[in-house]
């Protein structure tokens, strides 16, 4: 699996989790990045890195559903988020 394949796979899984938590806005942002990663790696790298800075960033996201924090999903999402950061940085 190439880095781009892995990035696409990670983005798919992150989108699935986000949609389950009714976070369509975030899912759509990640889907847009997935669409560009094969065609414009420079822009994809910039978009991935920009997810991680400032207030309200992807780093600040905590997953809840029906008012209950999703511990397992947050753990999985955190692993995916960290892996995406490192792969994006290497693009």
Show the residue positions of the predicted features.
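Amphipathic alpha-helical interaction modules
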Residues: 20-62
């Amino acid at each position: 699996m190439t880095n781009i394949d892995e990035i696409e796979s990670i983005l798919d899984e992150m989108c699935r989790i986000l949609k389950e938590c009714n976070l369509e806005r975030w899912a759509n942002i990640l889907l847009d990045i997935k669409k560009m990663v094969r065609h414009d790696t420079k822009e994809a790298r910039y978009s991935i890195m920009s997810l991680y800075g400032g207030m309200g960033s992807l780093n600040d996201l905590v997953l809840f559903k029906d008012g209950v924090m999703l511990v397992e999903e947050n753990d999985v999402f955190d692993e995916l988020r960290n892996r995406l950061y490192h792969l994006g940085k290497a693009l």
